[in-house]
Amino acid sequence: MGVTGILQLPRDRFKRTSFFLWVIILFQRTFSIPLGVIHNSTLQVSDVDKLVCRDKLSSTNQLRSVGLNLEGNGVATDVPSATKRWGFRSGVPPKVVNYEAGEWAENCYNLEIKKPDGSECLPAAPDGIRGFPRCRYVHKVSGTGPCAGDFAFHKEGAFFLYDRLASTVIYRGTTFAEGVVAFLILPQAKKDFFSSHPLREPVNATEDPSSGYYSTTIRYQATGFGTNETEYLFEVDNLTYVQLESRFTPQFLLQLNETIYTSGKRSNTTGKLIWKVNPEIDTTIGEWAFWETKKNLTRKIRSEELSFTAVSNRAKNISGQSPARTSSDPGTNTTTEDHKIMASENSSAMVQVHSQGREAAVSHLTTLATISTSPQPPTTKPGPDNSTHNTPVYKLDISEATQVEQHHRRTDNDSTASDTPPATTAAGPLKAENTNTSKGTDLLDPATTTSPQNHSETAGNNNTHHQDTGEESASSGKLGLITNTIAGVAGLITGGRRARREAIVNAQPKCNPNLHYWTTQDEGAAIGLAWIPYFGPAAEGIYTEGLMHNQDGLICGLRQLANETTQALQLFLRATTELRTFSILNRKAIDFLLQRWGGTCHILGPDCCIEPHDWTKNITDKIDQIIHDFVDKTLPDQGDNDNWWTGWRQWIPAGIGVTGVIIAVIALFCICKFVF
């Protein structure tokens, strides 16, 4: 009886106690106030949570699949180098996966290749697959090739990124970028209470050259596409070409195009002119370091000598198609009839290029002071009918050059232009010498003439510095695409290669540390204050965009993580393939289990010796390397990089919670006082 009396509580006190507990539970659910005592042994926050992940994963909507471009890792993006990473194969069906956000691409590609019989090499894009919507330069390649396969795959196991769809194959006439797909926690978009932008479909470009979405198309002609003897010609117009023998950047090609126009070096006859650039010229001049971070450089072009051969109009077309022109493409693949965009009619020496709504004026290539001619040794050149004829040959000596300056300065509200004034051109008269050329002329001599029929004989001598990867992948062509890929992956994880890991990283410091992403905008959502320093709220209302800045190369680490994960998955693929073969072998053994003529191996012969390789250690080493690089690595303090907004806004949730607790306690005391 005494014990029962102790356990019983007065009815009024029980009501007050229950009300107090319900109030605590309610505020705990609202403000996430912990009910227990938290100390160091029960709560541990990692460096990533403290320093980087200010935007926590509050919902699964923030977890986005993002397409990361391979060019962010510093891979070669020129057309001769990029095409060596692709190969044809039959018997493998294409795979397509979707992704939600993509990275802005500096270089994209568009292929229209035909077989010698006129049939198409690449399949048409299925319904729903559109071109990659954010490309600074679109390299459009037309031509012919053997195309030994049904589909064109990536030899390194990467995807071809289209508009929110990643495919394992290349589609005809559809712009794509090379990349991989990774998952990121993107900051949650803030509500815009002043305007609500409707949901719009992505567009490839705009007609406004000052827009950050402006895209430029550069056109090429290719013969022997997909082979080691592929020849590429940069198209200036339908009769003027430039032979690509080294790693030409898009900016150099644009400046070269401007120089050819303004100096009057285009073909003014019915024959084709094929230019050959002096191999001593630095073709990397004007290279851009991705979208936002430009290289401030001043280069002086050395005196150069260009030679060309006038090709008769009776000669065979280079690619079997009517050539197109280089043009600025505002979303369509139409060609231009003149050079109004690439070089204005008044021969202006200024090429306007744009990035993210900010202009950068690039002063054009050179000022021609004198153009001299020199006679060539008399040789003969066979014509189309096996006869010899004279060909006018010009040796152009550009003896004076001006500095080329690319100067890009960021401002908070407006675009900037280069301080270099426009250069002027003065082209002198050209004098022709009636000479003959020989088919066996050495093409390395810039003073001699070249022709499209024989310029591939020594083209490899001038660009050996960027053909290593392509020749390695093509050295074992009989093994097939997947075998080559697996062999390359296996080579990446050997002990000797890992010992040189730091040296490789230091030798290739071209990783893009910034992730400039685009994604389809949600209904009624717009950009918040987090992105105002770079783009302003909801630029054009088309994309939710941002620039993620992280210390210590976190984005570079993410790129490397995605690549290493891909390599590990390739090993899993090989292990699965071998296990499948082993299963077939076991099936055969079971089929002959009742046969007693020497056993299974005697019946199956050499097939009995197949044994699946154990790749567990290699995969484990790769995972350990990822853990060492991205988990155990300490991060620097980011306190110095916090501005006033990101510095105090992180205390808002804590302030709201403390204020709520104080209000709850005051309300509780008032209620208790009123009850009593």
UniProtKB/Swiss-Prot annotation:
Residues 314-335, 447-464 have a biased composition (Polar residues). Residues 414-427 have a biased composition (Low complexity). Residues 1-32 form the signal peptide. The record marks L57, L63, R64, F88, K95, I170 as: Involved in receptor recognition and/or post-binding events. Glycans are attached at residues 40, 204, 228, 238, 257, 268, 296, 317, 333, 346, 386, 413, 436, 454, 462, 563, 618. InterPro entries: Ebola-like_HR1-HR2, GPC_FiloV, GPC_filovir-type_extra_dom. GO terms for biological process: clathrin-dependent endocytosis of virus by host cell; entry receptor-mediated virion attachment to host cell; fusion of virus membrane with host endosome membrane; symbiont entry into host cell; symbiont-mediated suppression of host innate immune response; symbiont-mediated-mediated suppression of host tetherin activity. One of its GO terms (molecular function) is lipid binding. Changing L430P: In strain: Isolate Chain. CDD domains: Ebola-like_HR1-HR2. GO terms for cellular component: extracellular region; host cell plasma membrane; membrane; viral envelope; virion membrane. Residues 554-595, 615-634 form a coiled coil. The mucin-like region seems to be involved in the cytotoxic function. This region is also involved in binding to human CLEC10A. This is Envelope glycoprotein. It comes from Zaire ebolavirus (strain Kikwit-95) (ZEBOV).
